[in-house]
Amino acid sequence: VLGVGLTALIWGGSFAAMKLVVQGGLSVGALLSLRFTLGGLALGLLAWAFKAKPGSRALLDSLLLGLVLTVIFWLQTDGLRYTTTSKSAFITGLYVVFTPLVSLAVGDRLRPSHGIGALVAALGLFLLVNEPGKPFGGWNFGDTETLLCAVLCGVHISMTAHFSRRSDSWTLAT
């Protein structure tokens, strides 16, 4: 329970931290370059320490995953310039709705609970972002960027599930 609480605290706190950094004047590109460079170096050192030897298929898979992840982080971070942290966190969390929908699009079957979950999440999104009297109910550009981020999170999770069947996890992670 403590681990779950700590994870939620770190994940939730990261939205506020990213918003402060972006509002402080650091460009999204510079922030993400720094973040991905540090993360890549750390994982690269671990892969080297464990003597990971990726094949060409695994390298291509990891490159594709990395490109999608870069767009995800770009959309989410840039979206924070226009929307609130609470809206961003909730909208991003809608990836749990989009992941099964992406799976459906590539031929997997859905359970009825997925449809119910999608409806409940859509209602929650409406209640969170709707501001009567404002144009488009208060929906803004940052909300749109973050929604695209959530859709791509679903794509990324589905891609990871597919690629992990054929590629080494260390290679996919780095």
Indicate residue ranges for each PLM-predicted region.
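Glycine-/small-residue-enriched transmembrane alpha-helix faces in small-molecule transporters
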Residues: V1-S33, L67, V71, L75, ...
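Small-residue-rich packing faces within the transmembrane alpha-helices of Major Facilitator Superfamily
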Residues: G12-G13, T37-L41, V97-F98, A122-L123, ...
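Specific transmembrane alpha-helical segments of multi-pass solute transporters/efflux pumps
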Residues: I10, S14-F15, G44-T92, T99, ...
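C-terminal ends of transmembrane helices
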Residues: A42-P54, F98-L110, I157-R166
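Hydrophobic alpha-helical transmembrane segments
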Residues: V1-L6, S33, L59-L63, F90, ...
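Hydrophobic transmembrane alpha-helices of multi-pass small-molecule transport proteins
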Residues: L43, L63, L69, L110-E131, ...
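Hydrophobic/aromatic residues within transmembrane alpha-helices
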Residues: V21, L31, R35, G79, ...
